[in-house]
Curated annotation (Swiss-Prot):
Subunit architecture: Oligomeric complex that consists of at least the alpha, beta, beta', gamma, delta, epsilon and zeta subunits.
Region of interest (Disordered), ranges: 215-240
Record's protein name: Coatomer subunit delta
Keywords linked to the UniProt accession: Cytoplasm, Nucleus, Protein transport, Transport
């Protein structure tokens, strides 16, 4: 048997979901499914119809149909058995067989279809095995979701920690810069010492000038020493 595609359609033949197992274009699948309702008779008890070199094996799901599209050489009994298995899978996954519910659980349904059929050939699996596999997949997805959420939380905490660390570094840098600047008292002390030094220098210069002036005055007022004059006659008198 070769299953070309499995689809869930409404009564008008519009595909809600469809899974192709062999190379078929979407247009081709939609064209085949749109012709399907016209081939189905409400009074007929048959679950197979044929058209355009393909066979439709179908089963009602309330207001919907689950349909296998197979080639004409496929084993009808095996196809019907596969169809029953897939319909049980759908009813076990979805709580109600409505279009909205089918779309909501489309991923799980596709996964179950792939477990039951490989490249169009029926795999030797039971409904229990498929459900177990789906539960394992769901459990792994939950674990992965938890791991991803924990990673996001850790990344958020790391960003907060880095922001806080940068703020502390900025505060520390500002504090050190403030400590290295001289205070107002230091500025006043430096100014006072400069003025005092200037005045002290001026006083020393004034005292040196006064000492030089007094020394010059004393030198000018002192009596001049007379030296010996040569060649000048002395006025002398002889006394007898």
């Amino acid at each position: 048997m070769v299953v070309l595609a499995v689809s869930i359609v409404n009564r008008g033949g519009k595909a809600i979901i469809s899974r192709q197992f062999r190379e078929m274009s979407r247009v081709r699948v939609e064209s085949l499914l749109s012709s399907f309702p016209a081939l189905v008779s409400e009074k007929s008890q048959n679950t197979t119809v044929e058209s355009d070199n393909v066979r439709f094996v179908y089963q009602p799901l309330d207001e919907l149909y689950i349909v296998l599209i197979t080639n004409l050489q496929s084993n009808i009994l095996q196809d019907i058995d596969t169809l029953h298995l897939l319909s049980q899978v759908v009813t076990s996954i979805c709580s109600s067989l409505e279009e909205r519910e089918i779309l909501e659980y489309a991923f799980e349904i596709f996964t179950a279809f792939d477990e039951a059929t490989s490249l169009g050939y029926r795999d030797n699996v039971s409904l229990t095995q498929i459900k177990t596999y789906l539960e394992m997949e769901s459990h792994e997805e939950k674990i992965q979701e938890i791991v991803s959420r924990n990673k996001e939380i850790e990344a958020t905490e790391e960003r907060k920690r880095r922001i806080k660390q940068l703020e502390l570094q900025k505060k520390e840098a500002a504090r050190r810069a403030a400590q290295n600047l001289p205070s107002a008292d230091a500025y006043e002390s430096i100014g006072y010492q400069t003025v005092n030094t200037t005045f002290a220098t001026s006083n020393v210069e004034d005292e040196s000038a006064m000492e030089s002036y007094h020394a010059a005055a004393k030198a000018s007022s002192a009596p001049k020493a007379k030296g010996m004059q040569l060649g000048k006659k002395k006025n002398t008198s002889l006394l007898y």
